[in-house]
Structures are given as structure tokens and as C-alpha cells.
Amino acid sequence: MDIAIHHPWIRRPFFPFHSPSRLFDQFFGEHLLESDLFSTATSLSPFYLRPPSFLRAPSWIDTGLSEMRLEKDRFSVNLDVKHFSPEELKVKVLGDVIEVHGKHEERQDEHGFISREFHRKYRIPADVDPLTITSSLSSDGVLTVNGPRKQVSGPERTIPITREEKPAVAAAPKK
């Protein structure tokens, strides 16, 4: 009996860079793309290659994810919380951790009833004073938590290099 063997590199020549289907990466309560539900193109041809994720993936704001940035002068976290009102969100600083919590009770939307809750924690960098951290909510549902970074004190100086005549590593004794 003959058994057909399908080699994965024929279908996905860039296997390490191939991302899994977004179907399993979705957040509950969010929409799916039509391409996530119907894989007709992949079943019609063994040579069909799905576009790389960086070409087809939406930005972080459309996926419900967060973005943490550490810039030269500030630390910031941007978090998509468009499904929550300001009263349903809490931002706390506990030691060197920022904790963001959002919760809304069950309510009806166009697909039925849904309730949501999330907890996110972010470590505050050592050069950010926890007392200076602020948060704001934009009109499009992006929560921004940020704080200024402490500036490095003292001016920059060049350290001269001296040359020594002896080796840094002593020679091993000969046998």
C-alpha cells in the first residue's frame, strides 16, 4: 500500500517564519477575519503560500494587545481597552509593578451576551520613579500609562587608554 508523504517545506518554504493561523490567536469577543475561517486557497493548491504575518497582521491596536516602550526620556505602556469605560478600569502601582485591571459585567452586544475581565502587569524600569507615573485614556480607547526616566547625572567624559608593556595573561609554564 502506497502512502503519500507531504513534505512541509514544499508548502511552507520559510517554515520558521510561518505564523500559525490567527484562529487560535484570537481574543474571545473579538471578530475573526474571513481568511481565518475559510482556507479554500490552501486546499486548492499545495503550493499556495499564505502571506507573511507582517504583511497581513493588523497593528497592535486592532488586536487587543499592548505595547511597552522604553525611550530615552520616558517609559510608556499603550493598551487597547476600547471595550471598557473609564469607570471599569483601574491602574495601580504596587512596588515596582504597574497593574492594570479592567472588568465589565455581562451585557448584550450584537452577538449575544458577553462579559470581559483582564489583568496586566508591567515591571517599572529602575530609572523611573513610581510616584511620577500617570495614565490617560484616549477617545479611541487606548490607555496610556507613562512616567519620565531619570536623566543620567554628570557630563560625558572620554577615558584615555594607556599602553602597558607586560601581557595581561601570563604565559603558561613550559613542560
Curated annotation (Swiss-Prot):
GO terms for cellular component: actin filament bundle; axon; cardiac myofibril; cell surface; contractile muscle fiber; cytosol; dendritic spine; extracellular region. Zn(2+) 1 binds at H83, H111, H119. The keyword Coiled coil does not apply. Abundantly expressed in the lens of the eye. Expressed in ventricular cardiomyocytes of the heart. Also expressed in skeletal muscle and the kidney. It holds the Pfam family Crystallin. Zn(2+) 2 binds at H104, E106. Its main location: cytoplasm. Keywords: Acetylation, Chaperone, Cytoplasm, Eye lens protein, Lysosome, Metal-binding, Methylation, Nucleus, Phosphoprotein, Secreted, Zinc. Residues 56-164 form the sHSP domain. It is found in: Cytoplasm, Cytosol; Nucleus; Secreted; Lysosome. The modification Phosphoserine is found at S19, S45, S59. The keyword Zinc applies. GO terms for biological process: apoptotic process involved in morphogenesis; camera-type eye development; cellular response to gamma radiation; lens development in camera-type eye; microtubule polymerization or depolymerization; muscle organ development; negative regulation of amyloid fibril formation; negative regulation of apoptotic process. Induction: Induced by HSF4. Induced by calcineurin and transverse aortic constriction in ventricular tissue. The modification N-acetylmethionine is found at M1. Residues 145-175 are annotated as: Disordered. GO terms for molecular function: amyloid-beta binding; metal ion binding; microtubule binding; protein homodimerization activity; protein-containing complex binding; structural constituent of eye lens; unfolded protein binding. May contribute to the transparency and refractive index of the lens. Has chaperone-like activity, preventing aggregation of various proteins under a wide range of stress conditions. In lens epithelial cells, stabilizes the ATP6V1A protein, preventing its degradation by the proteasome. PANTHER family: ALPHA-CRYSTALLIN B CHAIN, HEAT SHOCK PROTEIN HSP-12.2-RELATED. Heteromer composed of three CRYAA and one CRYAB subunits. Aggregates with homologous proteins, including the small heat shock protein HSPB1, to form large heteromeric complexes. Inter-subunit bridging via zinc ions enhances stability, which is crucial as there is no protein turn over in the lens. Interacts with HSPBAP1. Interacts with TTN/titin. Interacts with TMEM109; in the cellular response to DNA damage. Interacts with DES; binds rapidly during early stages of DES filament assembly and a reduced binding seen in the later stages. Belongs to the small heat shock protein (HSP20) family. This is Alpha-crystallin B chain. The gene is Cryab.
